[in-house]
Amino acid sequence: MRAIISLLLISAMVFSMIEAVPLEEGLQLFEGERGCLPRNKFCNPSSGPRCCSGLTCKELNIWDSRCLG
């Protein structure tokens, strides 16, 4: 019984810590982890079919992809 109560308390603490990070800050951290470069609007190969700024990616050739608005 003590183990269940302890697990519930730990879960509540972890959830409250996750909620403490604002959504916008979390998105910025995520984009930074992907190595996004929104200034030149190139698609990051590891980011999948999306660009960092939310634009769609058009593949011009194997080595060059650009983001379209």
Curated annotation (Swiss-Prot):
Residues annotated as signal peptide: 1-20
Superkingdom of this protein's organism: Eukaryota
UniProtKB keywords: Amidation, Disulfide bond, Knottin, Neurotoxin, Secreted, Signal, Toxin
Disulfide bond positions: 36-52, 43-57, 51-67
Tissue specificity field: Expressed by the venom gland.
List of residues that carry Leucine amide: 68
Gene Ontology cellular component list: extracellular region
Propeptide: 21-34
Pfam family, one: Toxin_7
Annotated compartments: Secreted
Entry GO MF terms: toxin activity
Residue ranges of coiled coil: none
Domain notes for this protein: The presence of a 'disulfide through disulfide knot' structurally defines this protein as a knottin.
Its biological purpose: Insect active toxin causing rapid but reversible paralysis in crickets. No activity shown in mammals. Does not show effect on mammalian voltage-gated calcium channels.
Family under the similarity heading: Belongs to the neurotoxin 01 (U2-agtx) family.
Name of the protein described by the UniProt record: U2-agatoxin-Ao1y
Naturally occurring in which organism (per UniProt): Agelena orientalis
